[in-house]
Amino acid sequence: MESTPLQYPLGLKTDSLVKQVSEVLKSLTVTKAVGAFIVLFIIIPKVFDFLRNLFSPVTSIPGPLINKFSPWPLEIATFKGKSHRFARALHRKYGPIVVLAPGMISIGDSKEIKRIIQSEDWVKSEAIYGNFRQDFHRPTLLAFTEKKAYSRRKRMLSSMFGIRYIRSLEPLMKSCVDAGVAHLNKLCDNPSKSTIINLQHFIHGLAIDTIGVTTFGGSFHVVENGSHPLPSRLKAGMKISAVMQLISWIKYIPFLPKRDPYIEKFTFDIVDKRRKEAGAVKHQDLLQHLVDVCDDSPGSEFRTSDVQDESVILLAAGSETTANAELFTVIQLLKHPEKMKKLIAEVDKWYPPSEPDRATECAYSQTGMTYLQACIDETMRLIPGQATGSPREASKQEVLLGYKIPRGTTVFPNTQEAHLDGSIWEQPEKYIPERWLEIYSRNQTSAMPYWPFSAGSRICVGKNFAFQEMHISLTTLLRKFTFEYVPGQDETTVFRIAQQLEADSYKVRVKKRF
């Protein structure tokens, strides 16, 4: 049977179509080619994005019109480290649910937040955490968005964060705090006079050294020496990571390495050293647990690169969040001297000044020193590390506060809004640790809309580690030294992975108590 020539629109045959396309290509100048590229790959996709956003149910949610069609306001705020203030201002103006950007909303209602992060345990947002990875296909525990894969990784690492194991790290934590005490003793050489120190640098150095000795088997000696390349590079990396969560195109910049070369070499070398020491040297730190479960065979879910990435997250996130919580706690106490006086009385009750050489012991005092815990909890209520909450994703069409939420929408369960809800907390913006003593007495801590470590299956695995470190550090420092407030300090915060001071320095006066 005779074949029929393939027909095209407008009756063009194959050879005719090829000829016309060839003529069009010949007529293209560089300017026209660039123009065509812009139209095809920039303008047309933007038009489709605009139309999709125009007809999305998200446009019915309160918020500025520009936020519903452009990510720029949120991206600019994120780049400046002000996304938490950006969201706070929107909630104050528009209410408990607001649009942050196309496909992204923030919810400030405590009941809906609990539903999202705890009762229904929504998955983490792929739009956010998909960009928080050194290797897109191999996320860390923090950045998993698929529940089953996350559960497997969590089971693999769970023994590292149990109470029993965390307690075994107490001597290592104490060694760092002792080094910090020795350093302050040198600075306070005149017992009758106070000395001005950079409290921010000191507490961050102490936290970094603690994570170093418990994770990598050795202190970085930041407190004594003032700095170390690894934590400095990690801090810079955290700023980039915070921006990349929302401004993902940065990762497509040519020749931009996936990992900082210094961090890559440092972590690879230390893992390699551990393997060579296997059996000969016994290590009891967190890194050894990672190395023990590492397997580089084909198909392995936990390779050497995963050990490197998890150890970096432990160091960066662990030191940063704990240090900020400690720092803000001390700042709040310095600004409220009557609270500081009350806490010192509790410290002296458990560790009498007549026993200066007695070691601080968590097993002895952590659960009993309720006012210290109240001071920490009240600080984290007012200044939560995860200010805008851990972003989740609607895996199906949902309804929040009566508004339809399309599948795939990123939802920020806004922690700071719940923590400052005047219908739940009396005088919500005031520092009142005593409110927690009543909550503890009624055994209602878990019932409160209070999520500094998130909740549900994605609750921070390092919670017990952080509380133990803070208890040892703060109790020991308040036993040995008196801290005095220096007026005029910049207390503005920025939000980059964790809420932190914008300034690089926070000065206080310190002197020996005895």
Curated annotation (Swiss-Prot):
InterPro entries on file: Cyt_P450 (IPR001128), Cyt_P450_CS (IPR017972), Cyt_P450_E_grp-I (IPR002401), Cyt_P450_sf (IPR036396), Cytochrome_P450_monoxygenase (IPR050121)
Primary residence: membrane
Transmembrane segments: 28-48
SUPFAM superfamilies: Cytochrome P450
An example Gene Ontology molecular-function term: heme binding
Enzyme Commission no: 1.-.-.-
Pfam families (UniProt xref): p450
Enzyme class of the recorded protein, top EC level: oxidoreductase
GO CC terms of this entry: membrane
Binding site for heme: 460
Domain of life: Eukaryota
Keywords from the UniProt entry: Glycoprotein, Heme, Iron, Membrane, Metal-binding, Monooxygenase, Oxidoreductase, Transmembrane, Transmembrane helix
Pathway as given in its UniProt record: Mycotoxin biosynthesis
Cofactors that this protein relies on: heme
Cellular localisation: Membrane
Stored PROSITE patterns: CYTOCHROME_P450
Topology in membrane: Single-pass membrane protein
Glycosylated sites: 225, 443
Family to which this protein belongs: Belongs to the cytochrome P450 family.
Task performed by this protein: Cytochrome P450 monooxygenase; part of the gene cluster that mediates the biosynthesis of the mycotoxin fusarin C. Within the cluster, FUS1, FUS2, FUS8 and FUS9 are sufficient for fusarin production. The roles of the other FUS members are yet undetermined. The fusarin C synthetase FUS1 is responsible for the condensation of one acetyl-coenzyme A (CoA) unit with six malonyl-CoA units and the amide linkage of the arising heptaketide and homoserine, subsequently releasing the first intermediate, prefusarin, as an alcohol with an open ring structure.
Protein name as it appears in the record: Cytochrome P450 monooxygenase FUS8
Gene that encodes it: FUS8
